[in-house]
Structures are given as C-alpha cells and as structure tokens.
Curated annotation (Swiss-Prot):
Active site: D13
Family: Belongs to the HAD-like hydrolase superfamily. MPGP family.
UniProt name for this protein: Mannosyl-3-phosphoglycerate phosphatase
Binding site for Mg(2+): D13, D15, D214
Chief subcellular location: cytoplasm
Keyword Magnesium: yes
Length: 271
C-alpha cells in the first residue's frame, strides 16, 4: 500500500493519457493535479514532445519548475532547483537532432524510403496534422535529439528502414500519432530512472513511483515504475508489460484524462 503522503513521484505521458488525443483537453484530471500539487507530489511529464512544447504545457497544467522528460527520453529538463547539476538546464542524450536529420536525408535519397518529417513542412502544415495553434505547432519543430515523421511506405519497407536505423545506432519508435527516430541508447525508462535516482540522492530516500501511459512507447517507462496505470488508448497494439500483477497495474475503462483520473482514483481514493 502507498499514499500521497509518503515520498512519491508521478510520471505521466501526455497525448492520449493526461491530454485528450483529439482536443488536448485535460480538465477531467484537474482535481487530481491540484491535490497532488497541494501534497507536494511532483508530476513529471514524459512524452515524445519537444522540451519547448512541454515547458509551455507545464505552465498550463500548473507544473512549472518540475523536471520533465522530452523526446521519448532523449532530453531531460532539470528541475529549477537543480542548478548545481552538470548540464543544467537540460541533459541531452546521444545523437543530436541535426545528426539524425542528416542520416534520414541520406537514407531517403539513396534508398528511397518514403516519409515526411516535421522538418520538411511548415507550422501551418503541422497545425493541419495536429489541430494545434500555429504558435504551438512551431514549438513541435524545436527538436534537440530526435526527429518526428509520418511514415508513407509499406510495412515491409518499414522493417528494412528500422533495421538500417538500428545498424546506425538509432531506434524507430511509434507514438500516439507519429513515428520518432532517436538514439538507440535513449528511452523514457532510462530518463525516469535518472530522475528517481536524483530525487533519492537529494532526499536520502527512494520515492515510490507511479506511471501513467497509453501507448507502446510508454511500456519501458511503466516497466520501471512501482505502480502503473495503462490508460485505455487508440493504439491497436496496446500496452503489454512483463509484470501485470493487478496489485501493481491498473487498466482503465476510460480514455485520456478521464482514464488518468480513474487510475489515480483506483490507487489513492481508498487509501
């Protein structure tokens, strides 16, 4: 058993989890966000989004100043009070966005893979794809250690593309809407473990952890959590964990922020 009164960290995916996949609404989760904030429980956002996007969302959600995990773990934005840590304000893992872009351009030109990256289009096009405002769409292009793309080729070619990326030290990861290319060594799980270790070092006690996610790219994060909420999502593959002990893992009946609230209700309301 655990409660929000003990040292606790909550790690949360965004699109399809804390945010509605289509409207980006988060209001159903607002009461729990307020309760966690009042209990001094950090809610650490963890997403494929850029750090620029996530810093904007932190302010919207009342989570400013906390650490966050961007670009599927390739970027860690440090907490405001962690200024003494090397790399402040951000730690970037592995290959840079520019280097990945060069690799992708070479593969497209020489091996004729079909895809469109966010670097190929303007913010107006991204607005059409996502429903975001123009100003928010511009933030989606500020990648530091990954590339986001739409795949426009066959499944067979995707397998070949993935293999080529792996040979070059990169990974190809599916998100809620788009695909992402990043360093093979990066991941939400590694980033979360680093943040957990930092909190433990600063407080002298390892915090209990709860993670929430809805897609296959959230599985590594949820695997390293003490407790996990798998929010019902739109992805046909779903989320599958090695340890799905019902005492540790809760699968919601609701989607998006309604499911996020359901997961928190399950683990805490009776405690």
């Amino acid at each position: 058993m655990f409660s929000i009164q003990q040292p606790l960290l909550v790690f949360s995916d965004l699109d399809g989890t804390l945010l509605d996949s289509h409207s980006y609404d988060w209001q159903p989760a607002a009461p729990w966000l307020t309760r966690l904030r009042e209990a001094n429980v950090p809610v650490i956002l963890c997403s494929s989004k850029t750090s620029a996007e996530m810093l904007y969302l932190q302010k919207t959600l009342g989570l400013q100043g906390l650490p966050l995990i961007a670009e599927n773990g390739a970027v860690i934005q440090l907490a405001e009070q962690w200024q003494e840590i090397d790399g402040f304000p951000r730690i970037i893992s592995g290959i840079s966005h520019g280097e990945i872009s060069q690799v992708l351009n070479t593969l497209r030109e020489k091996e004729h893979f079909k895809f469109t990256t966010f670097d190929d289009v303007d913010d107006a096009t991204i607005t059409e794809w996502t429903g975001l405002s123009r100003s928010q769409a511009a933030l989606t292009q500020l990648h530091e250690a990954s590339v986001t793309l739409i795949w426009r080729d066959s499944d067979e070619r995707m397998a070949q593309f993935t293999a080529r990326l792996n040979e070059l030290g990169l990974q190809f990861m599916q998100g809620a809407r788009f695909w992402h290319v990043l360093d093979a060594s990066a991941g939400k799980d590694q980033a979360a473990n680093w943040i957990i270790a930092t909190y433990q070092q600063l407080s002298g006690k390892r915090p209990t952890t709860l993670g929430l996610g809805d897609g296959p790219n959230d599985a590594p994060l949820l695997e390293v959590m003490d407790y996990a909420v798998i929010v019902k999502g739109l992805n046909r593959e779903g989320v599958h964990l090695h340890d799905e002990d019902p005492a540790r893992v809760w699968r919601t009946q609701r989607e998006g922020p309604e499911g996020w609230r359901e997961g928190l209700d399950h683990f805490f309301s009776a405690r």
